[in-house]
């Protein structure tokens, strides 16, 4: 089990390649499609079956022979053609896995079969440094922002508020000193006895400007951090992994576009992990069972 797991991790993601395919069939000429490359997966998507220009006006039946799910040979009729009735047939992406044989069951031909040859090439595995970077990036995205970590960025706003409060206090102190200097000058000047009352009033004004105005600033201090805490305490929503049905829909869309899915279970599991970022074995197993039905 450990060796198979290491092999799956060492395999890179599959990169599909598409090539043109075409062959000619005659009464005594069949076409055999074999692949000696065992490292990559091959699949043929047949598109059209067409009678050649020199074909007779007779019935032509095109037959394909391949292996079924249990590995037993089976034969399937692909198209029935006749020059005066139906000279060409569109198969619309009839996918077949090699090895297989195409032949004329009846008719003299020539008949031309065209389609696409799909090859799933394995990309080179990433280096250890790149794997570590991806793991660190995934771990950072999965961790939601906690309340304790969100308190640290609030120090800078508090410092800036304290600096503003200190500047306001300094301005208030300067204003108080100016008022006191004015009061001293008024006291020194020869005035009547009732002149003492304005001095007391001025002292009260100075107290109001100095001492009474200071408590108003902490109120603003207590209000602003609360709103900032509420904003910082809200954790970031982590990315929700795709559900089983969403992954099936994406795979079906890629199949409809002409891409092929891996035939072997280890490669299929690696394909799901790399392309859809899921590690749930139950989901991978369910997708593998669904892939068998395609």
Curated annotation (Swiss-Prot):
<dbReference type="GO" id="GO:0042274">
    <property type="term" value="P:ribosomal small subunit biogenesis"/>
</dbReference>
<dbReference type="GO" id="GO:0051059">
    <property type="term" value="F:NF-kappaB binding"/>
</dbReference>
<dbReference type="GO" id="GO:0060699">
    <property type="term" value="P:regulation of endoribonuclease activity"/>
</dbReference>
<dbReference type="InterPro" id="IPR032569">
    <property type="entry name" value="NPM1_C"/>
</dbReference>
<dbReference type="GO" id="GO:0042273">
    <property type="term" value="P:ribosomal large subunit biogenesis"/>
</dbReference>
<dbReference type="GO" id="GO:0006281">
    <property type="term" value="P:DNA repair"/>
</dbReference>
<feature type="compositionally biased region" description="Acidic residues">
    <location>
        <begin position="161"/>
        <end position="186"/>
    </location>
</feature>
<dbReference type="InterPro" id="IPR024057">
    <property type="entry name" value="Nucleoplasmin_core_dom"/>
</dbReference>
<feature type="region of interest" description="Disordered">
    <location>
        <begin position="121"/>
        <end position="244"/>
    </location>
</feature>
<dbReference type="GO" id="GO:0007098">
    <property type="term" value="P:centrosome cycle"/>
</dbReference>
<dbReference type="GO" id="GO:0003723">
    <property type="term" value="F:RNA binding"/>
</dbReference>
<dbReference type="Pfam" id="PF03066">
    <property type="entry name" value="Nucleoplasmin"/>
</dbReference>
<feature type="compositionally biased region" description="Basic and acidic residues">
    <location>
        <begin position="223"/>
        <end position="233"/>
    </location>
</feature>
<dbReference type="GO" id="GO:0000055">
    <property type="term" value="P:ribosomal large subunit export from nucleus"/>
</dbReference>
<keyword id="KW-0694">RNA-binding</keyword>
<feature type="site" description="Interaction between pentamers">
    <location>
        <position position="57"/>
    </location>
</feature>
<comment type="function">
    <text>Acts as a chaperonin for the core histones H3, H2B and H4. Associated with nucleolar ribonucleoprotein structures and bind single-stranded nucleic acids. It may function in the assembly and/or transport of ribosome. May stimulate endonuclease activity on apurinic/apyrimidinic (AP) double-stranded DNA. May inhibit endonuclease activity on AP single-stranded RNA.</text>
</comment>
<keyword id="KW-0963">Cytoplasm</keyword>
<dbReference type="GO" id="GO:0003682">
    <property type="term" value="F:chromatin binding"/>
</dbReference>
<dbReference type="GO" id="GO:0005813">
    <property type="term" value="C:centrosome"/>
</dbReference>
<dbReference type="GO" id="GO:0045944">
    <property type="term" value="P:positive regulation of transcription by RNA polymerase II"/>
</dbReference>
<dbReference type="InterPro" id="IPR004301">
    <property type="entry name" value="Nucleoplasmin"/>
</dbReference>
<dbReference type="GO" id="GO:0000056">
    <property type="term" value="P:ribosomal small subunit export from nucleus"/>
</dbReference>
<feature type="site" description="Interaction between pentamers">
    <location>
        <position position="82"/>
    </location>
</feature>
<dbReference type="GO" id="GO:1990904">
    <property type="term" value="C:ribonucleoprotein complex"/>
</dbReference>
<keyword id="KW-0539">Nucleus</keyword>
<dbReference type="GO" id="GO:0010824">
    <property type="term" value="P:regulation of centrosome duplication"/>
</dbReference>
<dbReference type="GO" id="GO:0005634">
    <property type="term" value="C:nucleus"/>
</dbReference>
<comment type="subunit">
    <text>Decamer formed by two pentameric rings associated in a head-to-head fashion.</text>
</comment>
<dbReference type="GO" id="GO:0008285">
    <property type="term" value="P:negative regulation of cell population proliferation"/>
</dbReference>
<dbReference type="GO" id="GO:0005654">
    <property type="term" value="C:nucleoplasm"/>
</dbReference>
<keyword id="KW-0143">Chaperone</keyword>
<feature type="short sequence motif" description="Nuclear localization signal">
    <location>
        <begin position="153"/>
        <end position="158"/>
    </location>
</feature>
<dbReference type="GO" id="GO:0032071">
    <property type="term" value="P:regulation of endodeoxyribonuclease activity"/>
</dbReference>
<dbReference type="GO" id="GO:0042393">
    <property type="term" value="F:histone binding"/>
</dbReference>
<dbReference type="GO" id="GO:0051082">
    <property type="term" value="F:unfolded protein binding"/>
</dbReference>
<dbReference type="GO" id="GO:0006338">
    <property type="term" value="P:chromatin remodeling"/>
</dbReference>
<protein>
    <recommendedName>
        <fullName>Nucleophosmin</fullName>
    </recommendedName>
</protein>
<dbReference type="GO" id="GO:0005730">
    <property type="term" value="C:nucleolus"/>
</dbReference>
<feature type="short sequence motif" description="Nuclear localization signal">
    <location>
        <begin position="190"/>
        <end position="196"/>
    </location>
</feature>
<dbReference type="Pfam" id="PF16276">
    <property type="entry name" value="NPM1-C"/>
</dbReference>
<dbReference type="GO" id="GO:0090398">
    <property type="term" value="P:cellular senescence"/>
</dbReference>
